[in-house]
Amino acid sequence: MNIRKRTGEVVPFQEEKILNAMKKAFSGQAQELDDRVLDEMLSVVLKRLPENGGLTVERVQDEVERVLMECGHYEVAKAYILYREKRAALRRVRAGLAREVGDDALEDVLRQIQKDFEEEVYPLSALQLKFESFCKPAMTMEAKMEALTKAAVELTTVEAPKWEFIAARLLNHTFSKRNASRWTERGVKGLYEKLRYLTDKGLYGDYILARYSREEIDTAEGFLCPERDTLFTYSGLDLLLKRYVIQSRSREPLETPQEMFLGIALHLAMNEASGRMDWVRRFYDMLSRMEVTMATPTMSNARKPHHQLSSCFIDTVPDSLDGIYRSVDNFAKVSKFGGGMGLYFGKVRATGSAIRGFQGAAGGVIRWIRLVNDTAVAVDQLGMRQGAVAVYLDAWHKDLPEFLQLRTNNGDDRMKAHDVFPAVCYPDLFWKLAEKNLDAPWHLMCPHDILTVKGYALEDYWGEEWEKRYLDCVSDPRIGKRTVTVKDIVRLVLRSAVETGTPFAFNRDAVNRMNPNGHAGMIYCSNLCTEIAQNMAPIEHISTEVRTENGDTVVVTATRPGEFVVCNLASLSLGNLPVEDDAYLERTVETAVRALDNVIDLNFYPLEYARLTNHKYRSIGLGVSGYHHMLAKRGIRWESEEHLAFADAVFERINYAAIRADTALAREKGCYALFEGSDWQTGAYFEKRGYASGKWRELAETVAAQGMRNAYLLAIAPTSSTSILSGTSAGIDPVMRRFFLEEKKGSILPRVAPELSLDTWWYYKAAHLIDQSWSVRAAGVRQRHIDQAQSMNLYITNDYTMRQVLALYLDAWRSGVKTIYYIRSKSLEVEDCESCAS
């Protein structure tokens, strides 16, 4: 027997649905009825239904009402009637909205919204009222859908935050209809045909269809779960459709969100030797469930012809004209493909230094940094956004005072570089003096003078050896000095930090002390977002020769590649993961580590220097987002010992899972080239971090025997963009506010703390209201488990004194924190890095 639904659809009749409806009617009145009595009433209802067709939902419900009344269950029957009236009212609202918009298919979307969201808080009648206020005569159906979506966005409030999910569903409905129409016009059906079309148009990398058969693409299409689109907030879906999915050259999106995730998975699993389609599925699942986000370049560029997947690069600028211009050229090429850059200027001679023996000839680092600044502005990624670069200088460099005023608004504009991000590399000695005696002298020197007089580069040392050589240089009268007090430098640093958010801080001794690959090199600085700490070395010019090749005269320049650092990033979305479930967490970390390792081999490198270093070290940076989201969901206050203990446990588990996954990869695919002699191999990595339990000792032995696939594993990026995609909080930062409205390009976007509710409200304390000493302590706790660094911001208000800000820097140094990113003053707007938005 069949039954006709209210939509007109005819489906098989299921009598158990009647039984369930009657049970709900009784339980709604707090009444329990014997199953035998219910079965008897059901039997009466069934006997009264027509057997010769024409059965409808309305007829069934009418008979249920009559039977309830006849059996004396008047209150239940009354409630049942009222329930039917309520459902009828809901149907009228959604049908009316669909009719006003002129889109019959919209009714199904609205029906699901009514099913998934509480009617008392999210009534479609409120959406209809708001929508009608936006409607104008002669609006097209698409314009009406935009107005309906805008209405849902504007209904988002602290009391009703889930309207942003409803707005996302409406946006997705509009996009899906438009996208389906585009492909129908092109006569394209199915995923394989779509990929063939995109490949032929030069929008998809031809390597995907070259490596996967049609059968495999068809299998992958079966992995797609369109229902996961409901995980998006409006802000996340809007961002994804505008920036991440493949677009035509006229900027129309041609990929669904799920097709984007699957395309990334196909790319990342491409080289898997066995079980490749299983890895495609695992990569797709972790991305589409929003449990892991890849960095913005990976999300944007995987599956495309120019698949530059890395976020940031770091170069050591040599002290030569050729070397400086080579570094600037390297930055331009990196920026062209969307990468951010960190440049270490600590080797470049200071203002007034000698050139070829001519005293006072050198112009110093500022003029070169201005050249970098202009390159960042000029190479703007097809007009999308200008390049991004952090410039690092040592705390003892002679040009430091001018460097610390690069972005401030006062002073000589010819000495400014407003589009770069300055950062200072501090030795322990500086903080020791700042702690004990701010009036202590601090001697600034030129690296070229030191190299000329002493025969060594002071910046090539760290820790006690650096301090011994620094004091030796201070006492050598042949080396010119610019002597100031520690207080003078601190004052310049803090003034700039409060005014501009920079300079970033890099604690070079803490970094090198915990470097697992200190046997192979030195870390001079970090990257654009201060989360990367890997061995560095400048590119060296070897020779320039004139040759004859095929009858032509050619000039050949040979260089030694140095160590040009590359950052391959992804983030665990802690707010979306069951972090207490060891098995689930380990499987997720294993999948993410494997995906990142594959990035190294599948990447399109803008420079050969980058490719060589990346294959030599195979460094990755697995980080986290949703940190505050995770705490709030569990009822953990930011300013509490419970927070510190929980963070310690979670990050130890993440680190354990990452190392375990990495050594298993080494057994399967081989170690990185410099494993022998590393802290991984000697066990010093585990000793330095106090990992002494039985399971850690066992893991250390396994690592020593099997090796490590990747030289560096963990690094916490800011995730400013990808955290919006996954509907969680950014990186390890507290939320800025529980709720606020952001204006972007003429529209108002609601920003809501993830899963904001009465349960989480009090655990979402705003960033600027938090005692920052708790943030510093938490960073110190996490740092023990992170082999690289963290993009950690400090949030200050206008009430902070300079001494209080200095105290935070000192607390961070004492806690072993390696880097500090922005000082975010409440009155200051700072730019977020899009490259490291993993």
Roles of regions detected by a PLM:
Residues 1-255:
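Often metal-dependent polyanion-binding catalytic scaffolds in large enzymes
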Residues 6-13, 33, 101, 139, ...:
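Alpha-helix capping and helix-loop boundary segments enriched in small/acidic/polar residues
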Residues 79-89, 93, 163-195, 426, ...:
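Terminal amphipathic helices with adjacent charged low-complexity linkers/tails
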Residues 213-221, 225, 229-238, 530-534, ...:
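Catalytic alpha/beta core of large soluble enzyme barrels
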Residues 286, 304, 328, 588-611, ...:
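Internal maturation/activation junctions in enzymes
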